[in-house]
Amino acid sequence: KGNALGSGLGGSAASAVAGIVAAAALVEEPLERTELLKFAMQGEAVASGSVHVDNIAPSLYGGLVLTVGIDNPFVKQIPVPDTIRCVLVHPHMVLPTREARAILSKSVPLSDVIWQQANLAGFLAGCFTSDLALIRESLLDVVIEPQRQVLIPGFAAVKQAALAAGALGASISGAGPTVFAWVDAADAEKVRIGMVDAFARHGLESDSWVSAFDRAGARVVGD
């Protein structure tokens, strides 16, 4: 699958989904995606130690998704404006998910919860209405990012480089250390180079990608 361990790219979820989709292709009776989702969740639980659907659902369904519930999760694909690209920059370091979780506070100030909820609502509204200005205003994590950024050398500079090059927003992918940015397609390469250069200035080589959103999801390709 090409996802490094401890990268913040959802490697365990991608493995679980790939295995389930491949196995399902061998049976005579096709399985519904809802059934595949539950099987993949069990694989993710074995790999990561807990049952959760946040990485499984987008790996299986494709694109940006909203999930609600665990036992019978509700999955809704969220439309993304056609011109949006995602820039991903993975510095050559490993950040174990356990370490990234351990640094998080057990309590969150009410003011931050309110701000985070407002940002989420604005972000979703921006996606549904293709309002790039609203996405830019709302693509901000005020709860997790401030706590985890200390684990990623140069994060502040990388984020600032992305924004200076025209990104709508940038933050930590998963538990890190990969950093992502949402950008208009016209600015994607400039943003990618800026982020890579910022990591390099802090002594970290990196791999980087510019990707559109694959709305088709996991599937068997070729023979």
Residue locations for each model-derived region?
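A short glycine/serine-rich beta->alpha loop
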Residues: 1-10, 44-51, 106-111
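DPxDG-like acidic metal-binding loop motif
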Residues: 11-33, 60-62
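Phosphate-handling active-site elements
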Residues: 23-39, 71-74, 188-194
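Short, well-structured alpha-helical segments that form the helix of a local strand-helix-strand
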Residues: 32-46, 133-140, 192-193
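Alpha/beta catalytic cores of group-transfer enzymes, especially the acyltransferase/condensing modules
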Residues: 33-83, 170-172, 180
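Short beta-strand-to-loop capping motifs
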Residues: 69, 91, 181-185
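Active-site rim beta-loop-alpha module in soluble metabolic enzymes
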Residues: 88-150
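Glycine-rich, charge-dense phosphate/pyrophosphate-binding loop(s)
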Residues: 127-223
